[in-house]
UniProtKB/Swiss-Prot annotation:
Gene (UniProt): SEC23
Cell compartment(s), UniProt: Cytoplasm; Cytoplasmic vesicle, COPII-coated vesicle membrane; Endoplasmic reticulum membrane; Golgi apparatus membrane
Subunit annotation: The COPII coat is composed of at least 5 proteins: the SEC23/24 complex, the SEC13/31 complex, and the protein SAR1.
Protein name per its UniProtKB record: Protein transport protein SEC23
GO molecular function, a single term: GTPase activator activity
Length: 749
C-alpha cells in the first residue's frame, strides 16, 4: 500500500488505512484511528470547479456531492455519508457514467470550488514594530519590511503601530505631515475606548450634533496608495527615545500594543481576513502582558521556575494574551510573532495568539539574520497565478458516516463549538465540535483529526466508512473557495488486514501530536511514561513473541521502524526541555504542530547522509558509528542543516588540497553536501540554520546531540575505532529496544 501516493492526491495520511470494525476492536489497537490532513496541499492537477457545490439536503449531514455518491436513473443521488436521497439539480439531469460532472469523476476525491460570492475586503496586514532595539537591528528590520511591501497585493490594506514605552498608532492617510495617536503602554484599553478615541466626527449640516461614523478605516489603507508614505515613515523610525536606567531593561509595552491592535482591527474589519504581524526584540516589561520586571536583577522565567510555580508573572501574562487570542479567533484574525533577539520575548506566554489563529511563530537571534529575512519574505510566496499562498478567515468541517464520530483535532485551529450528531463524547485534542475556525491556512498547515469507531455490531465483509473534509476560506484573489476531500476506508475485524494497513510514519506523527497535547497539561515524566506504555501495548498486540523469551521477539515490516521513531521522539527537544528556554520549546512545538508527515518525521528523527571519495552519497544510521574520519556527513533536523567533516577530511581541507588541480575530486566532494544542503534550503519554512563544522569543532555538538549514542565513554566499545564516542549518559537505541522486548515478552505494561 503506497501511503505517499494517497497523500499526494488528497493530502491525507491515516495511521490505519483500514479501520477496526467495532468500538471494542478499536480500543485494542492502541494507536488512535486518526489522520494527518493538509487541506490546501498543492497539486498541479487539482480539479477546480468555477461554481458553487451541491450539498446534501439532510440538515444533519450537509455533505457535498462527491465521487462516492451513487446516481440513479430517476434523477436522484444518494449521499454515502448519511444514505439520504437527494434530487439532482435540473442542469444535472441526464448524468450518465460516461458523462459525469467534474465533482463526480473518480479523480475528484479532492476538488476546489471557486464560489460566486465575492470577498468584500482585500486581505489586511497590521504591522507592530518594537522600537526598543539597537539601531542596527532596527535598520535591518525596516529594510526587510520595505522590501515586503512590494510582495503584497497592491489592493491589500496595511496599518502600522510602533511601540516602546508608549504605543503609537500611525494615521497613514495624512499625506503632508506624519500623524499618529499615542496610547499609554501600561494600560489595557477596551474596544469601545479605542473606538471612541480614534473615531472622528463626520461633517454634518450646521445646527446638528456631530454623528460618529466608523472612520477607523483610515488606519488601514491600500498598499498602492500609501507605499511612498509608509516607506517614508519606516525609514524615519528611530530607537525608542525613552531613557533606560542603568541596570534596567527598556520599558517595552508589547501587551498594550497587541491589545490596541486587536481592538482596533476588531472594530474595523470583524470577520475579514487580517494578520497582525508583531516584530519584537525583547520581553514585555510593562503590564498588561508583562513577562519580566524592568530591573535586570530579576531573571526571566525558566522551565524550572514554571514547573515549580516560581514564575510570578507567568499565569497573569498567559491569561492576558489568551484573552486577546480569543478576540482574534472571534473576528477571524491571525497573529504572527517574529522574535529578533538573543533574549526571550515571552513566546511561551503568547503562543496561543499564533496556535489558535494559525499564525507564524519565528525565533531568530536578530532581525539582521538571513533566518529572519528570508523566512519572513517566504511568507509572501505566490502561486503560479501570482496570488499569495495564504488563505484567510477559514472554517474546517469534518463529516463522517455513521460508523465514525469525531474525537477532536490537534493543530493550529480553534473550536467553533458546533456539536453535530457525529461528535464523540471521548475527546482527544480540541473536541466537542465538528467545525473549526482556521483564521489562517496555507499549503503547509496540517491538522491531526482523530476518530472514534462507534459501531458495535459486526459488519459485512468489505464494509466501508466515509469521511469528508470541507475547508471554506478566503483566497488571496478576492474569492471565497471551498476545498473538499472525500475518502473511504474499509472496516475490518481481520488483524492481518489491519496490520497491512498500518502507516507507521503517520502513526508516529499522530502520537507525537497527542504527546505534545498531553505535555501542555501533564508533568513531563508522566508524559514519557505514557508514551512508553503505549509502545509496550502496541508491541504486545502486534509483535510475534513467546512469553518470557526475549530472543523470540519479532516486529513485522509495518511496525519495524515505529519503536525507533518513539525513541527519538523521547530524546527530542519537543519533550526534553533541559537545554532549551521556554520560548525555544514553544517555537519548536509550534512548528511540529504545523507540518505534514514527512517534515514532522525529519524533526522527530533527523536524516543523516554520508559523502565519501569512493562511493555515492548514501543515507546512514543516525548513530555515532556513522562518524568516520574519511567521510562528510549532512544532518537535516528541519531546524538545522549541518555539514560535518570527519577528522581526515578536515585536515585535508585545512591543508588546501581542494585548491590544487590534481585533487579536483576532493574539491567536488567538499561541494557535494553544500549543493544538497542548498536544495533543502530552497522551500523550507522557517529557513533552517546552516552550520559548517568538523571533528572537534564547537558546533559539532549539534550533530552529537542527535545521534544514537551506541558508543559512549562508558561502553565496552570505548577503545575501538568503530565510530565516534558520545559523552552522554543517555540510553542508546539498542538498550531501549532491549528493555522494550523484555517488558513486552514478560506481559508487563
Amino acid at each position: 500500500m503506497n501511503f505517499e501516493e494517497a497523500e499526494d492526491i488528497n493530502g491525507i495520511r491515516f495511521a490505519w488505512n483500514a479501520l477496526p470494525s467495532t468500538k471494542v476492536e478499536a480500543g485494542k489497537v492502541v494507536v488512535p484511528t486518526g489522520v494527518i490532513y493538509t487541506p490546501l496541499k498543492q497539486r498541479e492537477d487539482l480539479p477546480v470547479a468555477v461554481y458553487d457545490p451541491i450539498f446534501c439536503s439532510n440538515q444533519n449531514c450537509k455533505s457535498i456531492l462527491n465521487p462516492y455518491c451513487t446516481i440513479d436513473p430517476s434523477g436522484f443521488w444518494r449521499c454515502p455519508l448519511c444514505s439520504y436521497r437527494n434530487p439532482l439539480p435540473a442542469h444535472y439531469q441526464g448524468v450518465t457514467p460516461e458523462n459525469l460532472p467534474l465533482e463526480l469523476q473518480p479523480g475528484s476525491s479532492t476538488i476546489e470550488y471557486i464560489t460566486a460570492r465575492p470577498v468584500q475586503n482585500p486581505p489586511i496586514f497590521f504591522l507592530l514594530i518594537d522600537l526598543c532595539q539597537d539601531e542596527d537591528n532596527l535598520a535591518a528590520l525596516k529594510e526587510t519590511l520595505i522590501v515586503s511591501l512590494s510582495l503584497l497585493p497592491p489592493n491589500a490594506l496595511i496599518g502600522l503601530i510602533t511601540y516602546g514605552t508608549m504605543v503609537q498608532v500611525h494615521d497613514l492617510g495624512s499625506e503632508k505631515i506624519s500623524k499618529s495617536y499615542i496610547f499609554r503602554g501600561d494600560k489595557e484599553y477596551t474596544e469601545k475606548q479605542i473606538s471612541d478615541m480614534l473615531n472622528r466626527p463626520t461633517s454634518t449640516p450646521q445646527g446638528q450634533l456631530p454623528q460618529f461614523a466608523n472612520s477607523l478605516t483610515r488606519f488601514f489603507l491600500p498598499v498602492e496608495d500609501v507605499e511612498f508614505q509608509l516607506t517614508s515613515i519606516l525609514e524615519n523610525l528611530g530607537k525608542d527615545p525613552w531613557t533606560v536606567a542603568n541596570g534596567d531593561r527598556p520599558l517595552r509595552s508589547t501587551g498594550s500594543a497587541l491589545n490596541v491592535a486587536a481592538n482596533l482591527l476588531g472594530s474595523t474589519f470583524p470577520g475579514f481576513g487580517a494578520r497582525i504581524m508583531l516584530f519584537s526584540a525583547g520581553p514585555g516589561t510593562l503590564s498588561p502582558g508583562l513577562i519580566v520586571g524592568p530591573q535586570l536583577k530579576e531573571p526571566i522565567r525558566s522551565h524550572s521556575d514554571i514547573d515549580k510555580d516560581n514564575a510570578k508573572h507567568f499565569k497573569k501574562a498567559v491569561k492576558f494574551y489568551d484573552s486577546i487570542a480569543a478576540k482574534m479567533v472571534k473576528n477571524a484574525h491571525t497573529v504572527d510573532i517574529f522574535a529578533g533577539c538573543y533574549d526571550q520575548i515571552g513566546m511561551l506566554e503568547m503562543k496561543n495568539l499564533c496556535n489558535l489563529t494559525g499564525g507564524t511563530l519565528l525565533l531568530s537571534d536578530a532581525f539582521t539574520t538571513s533566518i529572519f529575512k528570508q523566512s519572513f519574505l517566504r511568507l509572501f510566496n505566490k502561486d503560479h497565478e501570482g496570488y499569495l499562498l495564504m488563505g484567510f478567515n477559514g472554517t474546517f468541517d469534518v463529516k463522517t458516516s455513521k460508523e465514525l464520530k469525531i474525537s477532536g483535532l490537534i493543530g493550529h485551529a480553534s473550536s467553533m463549538n458546533v456539536k453535530t450528531q457525529n461528535v464523540s463524547e471521548n475527546e482527544l485534542g480540541i473536541g466537542g465540535t465538528s467545525q473549526y475556525r482556521l483564521c489562517s491556512v496555507s499549503p503547509q498547515h496540517s491538522y491531526a483529526v482523530f476518530f472514534d469507531v462507534v459501531n458495535t455490531q459486526s459488519l459485512p465483509q468489505n464494509a466501508q466508512s466515509y469521511t469528508q473534509f470541507i475547508t471554506h476560506y478566503q483566497h488571496a484573489s478576492g474569492t471565497y473557495r471551498i476545498r473538499v476531500t472525500t475518502v473511504s476506508n474499509f472496516l475490518t475485524s481481520d488483524e492481518q488486514t489491519l496490520t497491512n494497513s498500518f502507516d507507521q510514519e503517520a502513526a508516529a506523527v499522530l502520537m507525537s501530536r497527542v504527546t505534545l497535547f498531553k505535555s501542555e497539561q501533564d508533568d513531563g515524566a508522566d508524559v514519557l511514561r505514557w508514551i512508553d506504555r503505549m509502545l509496550i501495548r502496541l508491541c504486545q498486540k502486534f509483535a510475534d513473541y513467546r512469553k518470557d523469551q526475549e530472543e523470540s521477539f519479532r516486529l513485522g515490516p509495518q511496525f519495524q521502524l515505529y519503536p525507533q521513531f518513539i525513541y527519538y521522539l523521547r530524546r527530542s527537544q519537543f519533550l526534553q526541555v533541559f537545554n532549551n528556554s521556554p520560548d525555544e520549546t514553544a517555537f519548536y512545538r509550534h512548528v511540529l504542530l504545523t507540518e505534514d508527515t514527512n517534515n514532522s518525521l525529519i524533526m522527530i528523527q533527523p536524516t543523516l547522509t554520508s559523502f565519501s571519495l569512493d562511493s555515492e552519497p548514501e543515507a546512514v544510521l543516525l548513530d555515532s558509528v556513522s562518524i568516520k574520519d574519511d567521510k562528510i556527513l549532512l544532518l537535516d533536523t528541519f531546524f538545522h542543516i549541518l555539514i560535518f567533516h570527519g577528522k581526515t577530511i578536515a585536515q585535508w581541507r585545512k591543508a588546501g588540497y581542494q585548491n590544487q588541480p590534481e585533487y579536483e575530486n576532493f574539491k567536488l566532494l567538499l561541494e557535494e553536501p553544500k549543493q544538497e544542503a542548498a536544495e533543502l534550503l530552497v522551500d523550507r519554512y522557517p529557513l533552517p540554520r546552516f552550520i559548517d563544522t568538523e571533528e572537534g569543532g564547537s558546533q559539532a555538538r549539534f550533530l552529537y546531540s542527535k545521534l544514537n549514542p551506541s558508543i559512549t565513554y562508558n561502553s565496552s566499545e570505548f577503545a575501538t575505532n568503530n565510530g565516534a564516542i558520545v559523552l552522554t549518559d543517555d540510553v542508546s537505541l539498542q538498550v531501549f529496544m532491549g528493555h522494550l522486548q523484555k517488558l513486552v515478552v514478560s506481559g508487563s505494561s
